[in-house]
């Protein structure tokens, strides 16, 4: 089955409102991105053979006229004006549902989607995480709830299969209720109001953790213990003064502690796999401290806008100090 015969894009629809394949092959993908219309399927037919329907940025206000798409696997309503999740109960084969950037206030009608692995409800007006049951979405792997008005991590305990959880840009004050989500590999909690790293020690599969732009003042000796697979840690734009607590992260490759209030580096010499350190916009003033703490195999360093970076020989000293360094701040390292 050739892609040309099974895909209809928005440019074709503009010329021909009746959606038909030029061959006998069924249409499986319909892209109506950027074509404003008040009602789905009002002036055009939607082939029941569709596997993928993209209605991004169409000014749609209501989900309707798609329940006949029994084979649909991917449904995208990004950047519309939808206020309610409805009229999708017959889409039993759905694997991906994208409602990013709409007007949703409530999570509802996510019922009996036995194949759903991807759900994006980011950039809406949701206040409470609710109505997400493991019996309804038993295969869920990725859940995106960024940029809503959520104040509490709750009602996710059943969703054990989740590997990627995005709750950034909400109103969270505490990391909590993640005890059962032992399969999480990436956790995004940036741009909240979190003051303490806790409640994640059991996430032994976690590879990426983002807590940027919160209200942290320290990492804490026990906060990250148990995260033996962590490879990337993002802690920029907090009020951190003490980074003690990193020592157990033996797999860590990328550390972002930029834009904090850090004066002294601690524990980095115990992280053998560290490739990148972003420590710009801090208070580090000792070249000796950096030399003692940073592994000689480091490949990328950011220390601009620290007192130490005002040294007239700053760049030359760093290049000599770290023989494998490939990038210092925003500039690639050139060696003679």
Swiss-Prot record:
SMART domains: LRR_SD22 (SM00365), LRR_TYP (SM00369), LRRcap (SM00446). The keyword Nucleus applies. It comes from the Eukaryota. One of its GO terms (cellular component) is nucleus. The keyword Zinc does not apply. Residues 1-10 have a biased composition (Low complexity). InterPro entries: Leu-rich_rpt, Leu-rich_rpt_typical-subtyp, LRR_dom_sf, U2A'_phosphoprotein32A_C. Residues 306-336 form the LRRCT domain. Keywords: Leucine-rich repeat, Nucleus, Repeat. It is found in: Nucleus. Pfam families: LRR_8. Residues 11-21 have a biased composition (Basic and acidic residues). LRR repeats lie at residues 26-47, 49-70, 71-92, 93-114, 115-136, 139-160, 161-182, 183-204, 205-225, 229-250, 251-272, 273-294. Residues 1-24 are annotated as: Disordered. Its main location: nucleus. Regulatory subunit of protein phosphatase 1. Belongs to the SDS22 family. This is Protein phosphatase 1 regulatory subunit pprA. It comes from Dictyostelium discoideum (Social amoeba).
């Amino acid at each position: 089955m050739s892609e040309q015969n099974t895909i209809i894009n928005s440019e074709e629809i503009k010329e021909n409102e009746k959606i038909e394949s030029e061959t006998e092959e069924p249409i499986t993908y319909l892209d109506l991105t950027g074509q404003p219309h008040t009602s789905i399927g009002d002036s055009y037919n939607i082939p029941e053979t569709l596997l993928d329907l993209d209605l991004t940025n169409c000014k749609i206000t209501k989900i309707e006229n798609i329940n006949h798409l029994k084979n649909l696997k991917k449904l995208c309503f990004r950047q519309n004006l939808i206020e309610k999740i409805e009229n999708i109960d017959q889409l039993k084969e759905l694997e991906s549902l994208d409602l990013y950037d709409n007007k949703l206030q409530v999570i509802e009608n996510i019922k009996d989607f036995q194949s759903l692995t991807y759900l994006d409800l980011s950039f809406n007006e949701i206040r409470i995480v609710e109505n997400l049951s493991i019996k309804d979405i038993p295969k869920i792997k990725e859940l995106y709830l960024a940029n809503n008005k959520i104040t509490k991590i709750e009602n996710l305990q059943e969703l054990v299969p989740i590997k990627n959880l995005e709750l950034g840009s909400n109103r969270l004050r505490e990391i909590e209720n993640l005890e059962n989500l032992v399969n999480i590999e990436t956790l995004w909690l940036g741009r909240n109001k979190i003051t303490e790293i806790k409640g994640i020690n059991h996430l032994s599969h976690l590879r990426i953790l983002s807590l940027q732009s919160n209200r942290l003042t320290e990492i804490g000796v026990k906060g990250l213990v148990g995260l033996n697979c962590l490879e990337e840690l993002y802690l920029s734009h907090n009020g951190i003064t003490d980074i003690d607590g990193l020592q157990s992260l033996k797999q860590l490759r990328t550390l972002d502690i930029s834009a904090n209030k850090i004066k002294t580096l601690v524990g980095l010499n115990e992280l053998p796999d560290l490739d990148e350190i972003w420590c710009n916009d801090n208070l580090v003033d000792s070249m000796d401290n950096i030399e003692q703490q940073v592994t000689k195999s480091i490949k990328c360093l950011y220390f601009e806008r620290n007192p130490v970076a005002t040294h007239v020989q700053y760049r030359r000293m760093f290049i000599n100090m770290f023989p494998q360094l490939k990038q210092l701040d925003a500039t690639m390292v050139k060696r003679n």
